[in-house]
Amino acid sequence: MGSHVAQKQHVVCVPYPAQGHINPMMKVAKLLYAKGFHITFVNTVYNHNRLLRSRGPNAVDGLPSFRFESIPDGLPETDVDVTQDIPTLCESTMKHCLAPFKELLRQINARDDVPPVSCIVSDGCMSFTLDAAEELGVPEVLFWTTSACGFLAYLYYYRFIEKGLSPIKDESYLTKEHLDTKIDWIPSMKNLRLKDIPSFIRTTNPDDIMLNFIIREADRAKRASAIILNTFDDLEHDVIQSMKSIVPPVYSIGPLHLLEKQESGEYSEIGRTGSNLWREETECLDWLNTKARNSVVYVNFGSITVLSAKQLVEFAWGLAATGKEFLWVIRPDLVAGDEAMVPPEFLTATADRRMLASWCPQEKVLSHPAIGGFLTHCGWNSTLESLCGGVPMVCWPFFAEQQTNCKFSRDEWEVGIEIGGDVKREEVEAVVRELMDEEKGKNMREKAEEWRRLANEATEHKHGSSKLNFEMLVNKVLLGE
């Protein structure tokens, strides 16, 4: 083995196989690469092939010290580009991924052109990797891609079962009255109600895959060498402090897209390595360049949310009624079991003031001066990118910890207005107008601008909290100094 190969530390990065998890893990991988680590980035075979289709035949060529590998996810093979069913995927990765992952590590360590594996950085929902790390005798860092408040709620999921709050007896318990039940026993999370807790507890089935999966993964997190979170101390300080008594060292190193820009640069060779499973339509940036400051509403429900055809129509006519210009990302698989089609009359009525895209470079969109508001599902990447762009939000949480993100955006960070789950065009129109035109929207924009400044400080300043936490993670955990 060549000495130059042996000297590098080798980190294997394993994202959960969904777009909103792959992107932040790619940023962690690039940050570590910029620090001189050899990187192996492990996608599932299905997503490996999707990357080839969306980004071209060289998408996973990598670089000499940044390699791509893949393992099967255990599900039937398909080449249809859709977001996989999350419960099915969770159950499959938990049951079927450990053996092929251990075999991949064995193959890597048998090669003489790469350094031996010295650490594993895995998504918090791929904790089967802990077994492999323990067998190899290398440290394992778990990356929970949620907000800190979302992760803390997951750490307390077991208490909801102990207290008889989950599973619920039947669907009648999903009333407003029951969902308004106070939850006052999660430290540092104030004025919580049952409806603000990540949605998997709302099941009637004690054997529900997601309820049990989350409890298991949150418990296994205690075995990690460290936990990393894509957040920053100023935003979630109290929550981060609370979880430090439950899990191993916690390092908040976000917002990752800002830290990555600082450390590796988006135009460097590694900076251009992408991880989007849909082809990005950059024409939307050209369109935004022609628009006035804070004049455009950006609408995107992320990579997993599905709407009913009726909800899509209500959102469409609500947006049309605002009279505002808008950029709306409509994935091909946005409508459950059907093609996402907006009414032709809507297209005609809004022809001169809208742009529709199937996917777009969201970080760049949310940092564009033309964007004045964001209608979002409150996924954590979207929420954080909105804060970093100084953009206030209309919040329509769909599932998982999006409900928790919505509550904190609304009440703690003061940058969000919530819209009811049962979408009505009149409400869409009213809240978008409130966001874009009224005093409340103006105040939220000022607050978002303040968070933008603090996010930049955390990642850009040499004594910024996230910058220092990242250095500590590298030196203490990955290098063991």
From Swiss-Prot:
Pfam families: UDPGT
SUPFAM superfamilies (alphabetical): UDP-Glycosyltransferase/glycogen phosphorylase (SSF53756)
Disulphide-bridged cysteine pairs: none
Organs and tissues of expression: Expressed in roots, shoots, leaves and flowers.
UniProt KW keywords: Glycosyltransferase, Transferase
InterPro entries: UDP_glucos_trans (IPR002213), UDP_glycos_trans_CS (IPR035595)
Similarity remark: Belongs to the UDP-glycosyltransferase family.
Protein name (database record): UDP-glycosyltransferase 85A2
Gene source species: Arabidopsis thaliana (Mouse-ear cress)
Lineage: Eukaryota, Viridiplantae, Streptophyta, Embryophyta, Tracheophyta
Encoding gene per record: UGT85A2
